[in-house]
């Protein structure tokens, strides 16, 4: 590990969102790392709300794995637990819920709780198709690195073509 987001007291990732920091020994006060089930000794956690680091740990996967590309649901090994999804043919659900396991075979299906139009008019519910140019997809928390996305945390959602960060709003 070469870098940890502040605060950090060791190169081995001493921070509140570090996963499985078994080698941290010199934290200043209370233990500043929390254990989890990441496969490596200390995965660099995703910097919410987006993760585009060289190494990160997908917290939205059923089995968190370290990946080397921008963190998207497709990075996870199947099945991948997405925070919001709706695919009756894949998940066995007919409506959007808080979470559901969607196999990678369902990748072409995009379904979100809210889909934003460029005019900021929103359509509640799910769309069983890709939004395309007429509708921006909301960011998939905790990461969003889609080609086109719509910041759901903005008062006026706008389409951006780069990784979704607060500065995009």
Curated annotation (Swiss-Prot):
Specify where the region named 17 X 5 AA repeats of C-C-[VGSREQH]-[SQTPN]-[STPAI] lies, as residue ranges: 8-167
- Which Pfam families does the protein's record reference? Keratin_B2_2
Primary role: In the hair cortex, hair keratin intermediate filaments are embedded in an interfilamentous matrix, consisting of hair keratin-associated proteins (KRTAP), which are essential for the formation of a rigid and resistant hair shaft through their extensive disulfide bond cross-linking with abundant cysteine residues of hair keratins. The matrix proteins include the high-sulfur and high-glycine-tyrosine keratins.
The organism encoding this protein is Homo sapiens (Human)
Q: Gene of origin?
A: KRTAP9-7
Spans of sequence repeats, please give: 8-12, 13-17, 32-36, 37-41, 46-50, 51-55, 56-60, 61-65, 75-79, 80-84, 85-89, 90-94, 100-104, 139-143, 144-148, 149-153, 163-167
Q: Share what the entry says about its subunit structure, partners included.
A: Interacts with hair keratins.
Q: Name one GO cellular component term.
A: keratin filament
UniProt similarity note: Belongs to the KRTAP type 9 family.
Listed name of the protein: Keratin-associated protein 9-7
Q: Does the keyword Repeat apply?
A: yes
**Which keywords label this protein?**
Keratin, Repeat
């Amino acid at each position: 590990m070469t870098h940890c987001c502040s605060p950090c007291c060791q190169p081995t990732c001493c921070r509140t969102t570090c996963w499985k920091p078994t080698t941290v020994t010199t934290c200043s006060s209370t233990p500043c790392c929390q254990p989890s089930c990441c496969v490596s000794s200390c995965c660099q956690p995703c910097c919410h709300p987006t993760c585009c680091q060289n190494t990160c740990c997908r917290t939205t996967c059923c089995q968190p794995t370290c990946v080397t590309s921008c963190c998207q649901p497709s990075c996870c090994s199947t099945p991948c637990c997405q925070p919001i999804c709706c695919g009756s043919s894949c998940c066995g659900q007919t409506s959007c819920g808080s979470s559901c396991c969607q196999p990678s075979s369902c990748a072409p299906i995009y379904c979100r709780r809210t889909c934003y139009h460029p005019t900021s008019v929103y359509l509640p519910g799910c769309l069983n198709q890709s939004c395309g140019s007429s509708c921006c997809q909301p960011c998939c928390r905790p990461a969003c690195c889609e080609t086109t996305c719509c910041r759901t945390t903005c008062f006026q959602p706008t389409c951006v073509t780069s990784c979704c960060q607060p500065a995009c709003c």
